[in-house]
């Protein structure tokens, strides 16, 4: 459109100038005509957002995402231009939405089941048209999603409760593995070990080196976050992305070895029912020709990294909030004593833990770790009166929406925000619709299991009156605590009247 307007046949400024106009006035008239064209071009879009400005606007907006991080840039632009606005990422029109009605439209329609991101970046991390998380091939995504849904619901979810409780107990008995010379325990690493061990037991069932793989998962996530929206020119300079390639290769090689061991175990098993799980189902699908070896490896990789990545940090944030709000801890402990008592938590207890559930929901609303969803329009559409063309990128700024609509005290952490049932359109920590998080049900149950099991044994305190609000964070692909910052300490005091005191911290 803009190039057409610059075509002299379309918009010839000079033919409107009288022959008597001095030659010296021609440059001024040309500049005025050019400014008029730019203004007309910018006003042609009905969606609020920064101007195109001969291509400078797209460069600036993409640069801001690279500089600030995806989450922070989304908050900046929504605050600047409103809850439905337009920018550009990699030269592609991108909508940033923090309006509940628009989010519901996007989430519930199959027109938006595709993801977006740098093709080269996704290829580097193995997610381009592969796996489930950022797979932008709708056909393959539909093929692999049922495997995840089967593993993460039904019998798998029920079995998870017992497996997770046992893993927590074992890791609390081996705190020395994540304890430094000063006697402090790295809480996030502890959570990552518990999550990885639980996931491995449920979905793969092959012995592994937890410490080694946890570090490799962090390297993989850092590469994923760094490469997701990098411009193509970045990948033409090998030394810029070589370290990310190495991090990805380290984890993928480790997973390939584990999956090969699983294949051998399945082949030599006398009774297949003894080794039936998520990985086995994928291996059988590969043998039938439904999936490739690469598909199988990537799906297992993504299943193993999901909980150690986001849920570990989410649980750490929840522990900080419990330490900051002792009245919340008191209410939770009262409910645990009433519902669970002295025994271990069981699957039947989960639905009765209403205070724990409200606490989890309020934590996910107030300080979400995953606060945005990235989609792409597969066909032309209209959202809340705005035209959306096929191929348009969309970012749903869920974290901002949770603080703008419905809740009585949106900027405070209080369980009052969930005293009444919240309509689903106003609270979507896991999304809904055809591309909602496959693990949203098991994640909620797992968080209840971890909190109940830990809080039955320990009170939670923080040193130096630290609080989550003023802790350094990086809000990019997801919101993570800045692990390069000074130490933030949490104390776990044994719940019984004993002199035992255990301090736990995360190196921030």
Curated annotation (Swiss-Prot):
GO terms for cellular component: axon terminus; dendritic spine; endoplasmic reticulum; membrane; neuronal cell body; synaptic vesicle; terminal bouton. It is a peripheral membrane protein. Heme binds at residue 437. Its EC number is 1.14.14.14. Keywords: Heme, Iron, Lipid metabolism, Membrane, Metal-binding, Monooxygenase, Oxidoreductase. GO terms for molecular function: aromatase activity; heme binding; iron ion binding; oxidoreductase activity, acting on paired donors, with incorporation or reduction of molecular oxygen, reduced flavin or flavoprotein as one donor, and incorporation of one atom of oxygen. It catalyses: testosterone + 3 reduced [NADPH--hemoprotein reductase] + 3 O2 = 17beta-estradiol + formate + 3 oxidized [NADPH--hemoprotein reductase] + 4 H2O + 4 H(+); androst-4-ene-3,17-dione + 3 reduced [NADPH--hemoprotein reductase] + 3 O2 = estrone + formate + 3 oxidized [NADPH--hemoprotein reductase] + 4 H2O + 4 H(+). Its cofactor is heme. One of its GO terms (biological process) is regulation of synapse structure or activity. It is found in: Membrane. Gene3D superfamilies: Cytochrome P450. Catalyzes the formation of aromatic C18 estrogens from C19 androgens. Belongs to the cytochrome P450 family. This is Aromatase. It comes from Rattus norvegicus. The gene is Cyp19a1.
């Amino acid at each position: 459109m803009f190039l057409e307007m610059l075509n002299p046949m379309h918009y010839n400024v000079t033919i409107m100038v009288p022959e008597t106009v001095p030659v010296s006035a021609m440059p001024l008239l040309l500049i005025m005509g050019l400014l008029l064209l730019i203004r007309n071009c910018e006003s042609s879009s009905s969606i609020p957002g920064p101007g195109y400005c001969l291509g400078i606007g797209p460069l600036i907006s993409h640069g801001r995402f690279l500089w600030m991080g995806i989450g922070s840039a989304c908050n900046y632009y929504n605050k600047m231009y409103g809850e439905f606005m337009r920018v550009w990422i990699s030269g592609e029109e991108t909508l940033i939405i923090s309006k509940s009605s628009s989010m519901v439209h996007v989430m519930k329609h199959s027109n938006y089941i595709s993801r977006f991101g740098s093709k080269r970046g996704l290829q580097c991390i193995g997610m381009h048209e592969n796996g489930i998380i950022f797979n932008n091939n709708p056909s393959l995504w539909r093929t692999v999603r049922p495997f995840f849904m089967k593993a993460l619901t039904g019998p798998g979810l029920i079995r998870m409760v017992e497996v997770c409780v046992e893993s927590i107990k074992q890791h609390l008995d081996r705190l020395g593995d994540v304890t430094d010379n000063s006697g402090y325990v790295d809480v996030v690493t502890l959570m990552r070990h518990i999550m990885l061990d639980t996931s491995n037991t449920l979905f793969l069932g092959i012995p592994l080196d937890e410490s080694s793989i946890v570090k490799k998962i962090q390297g993989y996530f850092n590469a994923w976050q760094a490469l997701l929206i990098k411009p193509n020119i970045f990948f033409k300079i090998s030394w810029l992305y070589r370290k990310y390639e190495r991090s990805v290769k380290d984890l993928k090689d480790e997973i390939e070895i584990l999956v090969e061991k699983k294949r051998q175990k399945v082949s030599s098993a006398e009774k297949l029912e003894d080794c039936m799980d998520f990985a086995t189902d994928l291996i059988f699908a590969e043998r039938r020709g439904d999936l490739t070896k690469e598909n199988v490896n990537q799906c297992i990789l993504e299943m193993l990294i999901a909980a150690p990545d986001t849920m570990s940090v989410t649980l750490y944030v929840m522990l900080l909030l419990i330490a900051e709000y002792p009245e919340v801890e008191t209410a939770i402990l009262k409910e645990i004593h009433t519902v669970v008592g002295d025994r271990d938590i069981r699957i039947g207890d989960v639905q009765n833990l209403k205070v724990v559930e409200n606490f989890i929901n309020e934590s996910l609303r107030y300080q979400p770790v995953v606060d945005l969803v990235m989609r792409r329009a597969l066909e032309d559409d209209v959202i809340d009166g705005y035209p959306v063309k096929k191929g348009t990128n969309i970012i749903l700024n869920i974290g901002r929406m949770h603080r703008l609509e419905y809740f009585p005290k949106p900027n405070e952490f209080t369980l009052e925000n969930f005293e009444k049932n919240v309509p689903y359109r106003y609270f979507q920590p896991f999304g809904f619709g055809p591309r909602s998080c496959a693990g949203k049900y098991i994640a909620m149950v797992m968080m209840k299991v971890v909190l109940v099991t830990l809080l039955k044994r320990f009170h939670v305190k923080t040193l130096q009156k630290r609080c989550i609000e003023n802790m350094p964070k990086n809000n990019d692909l997801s919101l993570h605590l800045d692990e390069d910052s000074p130490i933030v300490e949490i104390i776990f005091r044994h719940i019984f009247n004993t002199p035992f005191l255990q301090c736990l911290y995360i190196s921030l």
